[in-house]
Amino acid sequence: MTAETAAVDARPVASSQRVGVLLVNLGTPDALGYWPVRRYLKEFLSDRRVVNTPRLIWWPILNLIILTTRPQRSSKNYETIWNSQRNESPLKTVTRSQAEQLAGSIVSGEFGAGGDIVVDWAMRYANPSILSSLQRLREQGCGRVLIVPLYPQFAGATTLSVADKVEESLARMNWRPDMRSVPPYYNDPVYIDALAQSVRAGLAALDFEPEVVLVSFHGIPKSYVEAGDPYYDQCVETWRLLRERLDFSPERCPLTFQSRFGRAEWLSPYTDETVKELARKGVRRMAVLTPGFSVDCLETISEIGVENREFFIEAGGEQFALIPCLNDSALGMKVIRHIVSRELEGWI
C-alpha cells in the first residue's frame, strides 16, 4: 500500500445520512494593517462576479492604484469596529456565534436529528475559507451538505460567487457529496416578521422619534441588473413587504442603495446623497436600517453609523440612529433556523 493510498483509506467514510450545514458570509481581513487588508481586498476585487471589467483594463487599476492606496484607509476604518478581544471584525465574531447557536439548537433536539447534523461556517473571502470548512465537513463524515449563503437577496456578486467557490473547492477536493443551497429568502414571512420586530424594538429604544426611517441596501452596478440580475427587484420586494408590516409610507420609509465603488452608475437613489438631501429639506431626526446585511459590519457600523451620520448632521440634521442588523439575536437565529430547517426537509 502506498502512502497516498493509505492517506485516502484513512479518511472517514462518509455517512449518507450525516448532513453538513455551512453558513457563509462575505469575508473580512484576517488582521488589521496594510498587508492583511490588501490580501483581503485583492481576493475580493479580483472576483469576476464582483468586478466584471475586462482583466486587461482592471488588472493595472486594481494592482497599481487601488491596492496601493485603499488598504491603509480601509484598515483605519476597520480599527474603529475591530473586536480587540478576539482580534477580529464583528462579522467574524457574529457569524461564528450564529453557527454555534445553530449547532446548539441541533444538539438540543430542535431539528430532531441530533448528531446527524454538523454545523460549520466560512467566509467567501479570507478565512475561514470555504475550502477549509468543506474539508472539515468531509473529515466528519458528511455525505450531504447544505450551503447557507447569508444573503437574503440574490446577487451574482454574492450568492452566485459563493456557489462558484463551493464548486471550485469541491473540484480541488475531488469530492462530490449530495448538495443543496438555501435560496434567497427576501420575501420569506419569517424574515420579514423578524425585520419588523427588530425595527419596532430599535425605534422604541430611541430617545427621539425619527421623521424618516430609511432602508439602505448594498448597491451593485446598474449594468448588472440590466443584464438580468434580480437583486434590485428582490430588494424592492423586501422593502415593500417590510413597509406594509410596519404601516410606513414610502415617504416615511424611503429606499436607497449604499457603498458604490468606482465611476460606473450604481443602483440609486444613493444613500449618502439621500441623507444629505433630506437634511437640507428640513428632516432633523432619522433612523437607518440595512436589511440586506445579516450581520453588522464595516458597511453598516462605519459607513452608515459614522460616515452617513456625519453627512446628516453637517447638512442640518440633528439626531441620527442606526438600527442594528438581525445578527445573532433571537430574531436573527429564528430566521436562520427556519431557512435551514426548511431546506433540510427530506434529509432529516
Curated annotation (Swiss-Prot):
UniProt entry tagged with the keyword Cytoplasm: yes
Q: Which GO terms describe its biological process?
A: heme biosynthetic process
Q: Which residues bind Fe cation?
A: H218, E299
Q: Which UniProt keywords apply?
A: Cytoplasm, Heme biosynthesis, Iron, Lyase, Metal-binding, Porphyrin biosynthesis
User: What pathway annotation does it carry?
Assistant: Porphyrin-containing compound metabolism; protoheme biosynthesis; protoheme from protoporphyrin-IX: step 1/1
Catalytic activity, as annotated: heme b + 2 H(+) = protoporphyrin IX + Fe(2+)
A single Gene Ontology MF term assigned here is: ferrochelatase activity
Q: Name one GO cellular component term.
A: cytoplasm
Instruction: Check the record and name the InterPro entries matching this protein.
Output: Ferrochelatase, Ferrochelatase_AS, Ferrochelatase_C, Ferrochelatase_N
> Gene3D superfamilies in the record, alphabetically?
3.40.50.1400
Q: What is this protein called?
A: Ferrochelatase
Q: Which gene encodes it?
A: hemH
